[in-house]
Amino acid sequence: RNLGIGSKLLELAEKEMRKMKKNRLYLGRDLLNYFPGLPIDLKNNAEWFEKRGFNQLGNTCDLIKIIKDKNCEKLLLRNNTYTFRLATLADKDGLLELMTKNWPGRWKEEMIEYFNNGGTGREYAIALDGNKICAFAKMGFPQTPEPLESYSLTWRNRFKSLGGIGPLGVDADYRKRNLGYDIVAFANNVLIDNNATEIIIDWTSLLDFYRKMGFEVFKSYLYMTKEF
């Protein structure tokens, strides 16, 4: 450290971004990211980035729930109108349609990569209105192989049997019906049934929403970005 290596690496990264005509650089938040921002544990390093043109834009968190009693930690669903289950390969086109309509960026790309890596659909909890997929939650099981894992399992080696939830979302036409709560509750219950001892929800600022389900802050991060 203190030899200019970090500055040179950042300079090279910025050079490549400019070649690609990009005008904004984020710290973290990339596909298969390590972190969604600068870890609060390293907040003293924020000054280093600020001296190089980065600005702070708020923060985000990873949340955790420790499963002490399987029965007590399970959650009741609020809807009986929709069907909740794990996806299969037969749901691939339906998931692609959902992502293309609502989240055509990284979530769609992550889903495509998941299936290209041999995913069967099992890591996606889905809610259906008839045959239409109207909500999803990506999950990581304690047994999920590494090529199929999401950021929610980044910390898996620190735990006995970690489960993960995220990303997740509800179709724009189905919001404000408690489907967001229910898809998380369903994923929570499935992970408990699969012997998760802890569950992490990654990269969120919805603390009040998830605290209702027993989650608390595990790690915090600073959003930092630089405009070219």
Residue spans of the language-model regions?
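A conserved beta-strand-loop-helix scaffold within acyl/acetyltransferase catalytic domains
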Residues: 103-170
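Acyl-donor-binding surface of acyltransferase catalytic domains
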Residues: 11-80, 224-226
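Short hairpin/turn module used for nucleic-acid contact or packing/dimerization
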Residues: 176, 183-228
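Conserved hydrophobic beta-strand within the GNAT/NAT acetyltransferase core sheet
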Residues: 25-28, 165, 199-202
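Short amphipathic alpha-helix that is part of the acyltransferase structural core
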Residues: 60, 73-109, 132-134
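Generic detector of contiguous secondary-structure segments
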Residues: 1-23, 47-50, 114-133
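Conserved acetyl-CoA-binding loop-helix of GNAT-fold acetyltransferases
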Residues: 2-18, 165-170, 176-189, 208, ...
